[in-house]
């Protein structure tokens, strides 16, 4: 086909089908960042420099992680969160009490394109050893269904509402627990002065059976105190009205999406959450629960091109 001018369109008949050939692909049909396929030498060098400080291999055991400075830093960051949130206090193990074991879990966090952006180390407790009535009582916490997320996006799209997302860093550490629970010291980070001591928990840890409920109660109580109302059917949906404007908040454990008919209400909600919790990954909704989302003036598009 000969070269085309900017506004020129050619047609051709192939086996009875009419094919329209455009010089440029329609921009409104492109999903993803248009410029992502163009990488300059400077961008490539910056990317290589960044990835040089990210470990690609996920350790299976903490002994392997301790040999990699990237993972050691991730483990130290996790323990720093424990100190900030006053999660526990070290003490001798009381008589007739059994401590719950702890272990490290290592994961590489990826963005919507599948690129590794962070090494995440998480200390979890071995909740399978908990005994009902002793270490925990109630465990149920509502979780949003994927259908609810899609309905949220559909409602926002039909009402021209921009949807944003945020993530609560180490969310379960904010949940207050009522039971008396003791856990073993983190492997590789034992206190040399008291190697036989244990930690008494004041807040929830990942792996505890009551941790999801403790976090949900903490977050929902905070929202209800700030003039939100909880959905009658979907207990993970919260609403706040100011005059004729509405702010909608959908919760999926520690991931939150929200949107409003008034952009000022979204900005105020961000400040409200930051005043109580340490937040991360705040911005326009682009990647959520494995779904890639692109919000445009002509609609909201959901796809999973990273898996193709």
Segments from the language model and where they lie:
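Conserved pre-motif C helix in the palm subdomain of viral-like polymerases
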Residues: 127, 140-165, 169-172, 176, ...
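Mobile genetic element proteins and their domesticated derivatives, centered on retroelements
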Residues: 24, 30-31, 62, 75, ...
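Catalytic palm subdomain of template-directed nucleic-acid polymerases
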Residues: 109, 173-184, 209, 240-276, ...
